[in-house]
A protein has these predicted regions:
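Catalytic phosphate/metal-binding cores of nucleic-acid and nucleotide-processing enzymes, i.e., regions
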Residues: 1-119
Length: 119
């Protein structure tokens, strides 16, 4: 009998990606070594219906925010990603220069507070 081959990380990642897709989750895999260290291999927002036994418990809200300069709008791909987050129950938005004046992010905080209160 041949010894079993070890399961490679690549195969595990593929299974996780399939599982998340089956759950209708919005997901992405950040590029390794291209950002903040320690970020998980998979980032996802999985739809979750709040049940009576969950009332009163803290539940996280996945948030995706795209920042844009004044007069700029998200690309079609960026809008598609934001729509995916919303479809899965997360909060997605883009904030542009009008809402986030340099040096004065109080306006941005107000936009975020309003969005969270609407949920």
């Amino acid at each position: 009998m041949k010894p079993k081959k070890p399961v490679l990380e690549k195969a595990v990642k593929k299974e996780i990606k399939t599982m998340l897709a089956d759950l209708n989750a919005w997901q992405f895999m950040p590029m390794q070594n291209m950002g903040q260290s320690g970020v998980p291999d998979h980032i996802a927002c999985v739809p979750k219906v709040i049940t009576p036994d969950m009332v009163g418990k803290v539940v996280g809200l996945f948030v995706g925010i795209e920042a844009k300069a004044l007069g700029k709008t998200p690309t079609p791909l960026q809008l598609h990603q934001l729509e995916g987050i919303e479809f899965a129950g997360g909060l997605a938005m883009y904030i542009h220069g009008v809402q986030a004046e340099p040096g004065n992010f109080e306006a941005t905080k107000q936009v975020l507070r309003k969005a969270f209160d609407a949920e």
